[in-house]
């Protein structure tokens, strides 16, 4: 079994027609996963037999709009999705903001990024993912804007601009930017402080899992006065396949049944997160079983069962939904 991840921003004249075609194609090949179709393009995650996925990619490439799509592939023991969904959306990634993607950041290839990091070049690695993804794993010394969802990205950029005369003290818990205490060597040794005027003149490289979010993020940064902006081509998954674990720590969160994976198919990385209950190193990620909470959390098998699938003892006490299946 294999898993593929792909996207392309391109004008789609008849999204509903494409949605129907994609559902028919994926269904005929027994593929499972999610495909989002919008006027701005296509975004998909699928799992299936290698032969069937090969046929899918071949059929997709017959459409000239998609002939140059770069697929991110991975090996899986079983299907990484439970059902097939092909949905019509306003966007192929939920952002709630419009940008001119013709003015997006330049691509930087994974091997080019590795060389920069090997040589200790002064670059800003900006993680465009959500908090729980960043917490599970990230590039060493990467900056994160404390995003609960990608929709908050414009607001966080405005916060930077609105405070361009104020430096952020990263010794406080309510910082707007996370994890800067570990970045002093990358940030010209400016101890615990960063601001808009400093950031906008630096080489910023945005990254996300597969590229679909950092493409929009890079364009938004450029619209807001950050000129030297790049995006990691193919995202974290392509970097891991080509460069291994170099300059990476932890796992990579993926939106399927695997939860978190190693970015290097040939080696395992140590978890940088802890079980919420026993506090031992762990990267097994779950959704809280309490529907009113539903947040992601990490827990080992034993503690997951003790918590009845919830993220905390409090949520366990308020659990209203039917009992969840315990892990064997």
What label would you give each PLM region?
Residues 115-119, 197:
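A short acidic-Thr-Gly-centered motif at the start of a beta-strand
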Residues 1-104, 130-169, 183-203, 212-328:
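Rhodanese-like catalytic fold shared by cysteine-dependent sulfurtransferases
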Residues 104-109, 117-118:
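A conserved helix-loop-strand patch within extracytoplasmic ligand-binding domains
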Residues 209:
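Aromatic-flanked redox-active Cys/Sec active sites in thiol-based oxidoreductases
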């Amino acid at each position: 079994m294999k898993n593929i991840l792909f996207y392309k921003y391109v004008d789609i004249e008849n999204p509903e027609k494409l949605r129907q075609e994609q559902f028919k194609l994926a269904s005929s090949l027994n593929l499972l996963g999610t495909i989002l179709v919008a006027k701005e393009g296509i975004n998909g995650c699928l799992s299936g037999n290698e032969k069937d996925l090969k046929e899918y990619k071949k059929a997709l490439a017959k459409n000239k709009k998609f002939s140059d799509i770069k697929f991110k592939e991975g090996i899986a023991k079983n299907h990484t999705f439970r059902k097939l969904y092909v949905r019509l959306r306003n966007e192929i990634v939920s952002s709630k903001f419009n940008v001119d993607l013709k003015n997006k950041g330049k691509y930087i290839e994974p091997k080019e990024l590795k060389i920069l990091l090997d040589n200790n070049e002064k670059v800003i690695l900006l993680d465009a993912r959500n908090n729980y993804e960043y917490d599970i794993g990230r590039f060493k010394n990467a900056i994160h804007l404390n995003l609960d969802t990608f929709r908050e990205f414009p607001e966080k950029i405005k916060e930077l601009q609105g405070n361009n005369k104020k430096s952020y003290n990263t010794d406080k818990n309510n910082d707007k930017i996370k994890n800067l205490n570990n970045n002093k060597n990358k940030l010209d040794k400016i101890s615990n402080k960063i601001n808009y005027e400093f950031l906008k003149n630096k080489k910023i490289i945005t990254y996300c899992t597969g590229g679909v979010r950092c493409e929009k993020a890079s364009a938004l940064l450029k619209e807001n006065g950050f000129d030297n902006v790049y995006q990691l081509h193919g995202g974290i998954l392509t970097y891991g396949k080509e460069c291994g674990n170099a300059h990476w720590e932890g796992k990579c969160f993926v939106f399927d049944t695997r939860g978190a994976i190693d970015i290097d198919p040939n080696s395992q990385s140590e978890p940088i997160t802890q079980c919420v209950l026993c506090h031992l190193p762990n990267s097994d990620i779950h959704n809280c079983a309490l529907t009113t909470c539903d947040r992601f959390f990490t827990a080992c098998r034993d503690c997951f069962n003790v918590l009845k699938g919830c993220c905390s003892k409090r949520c366990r006490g308020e659990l209203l939904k039917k009992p969840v299946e315990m892990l064997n």
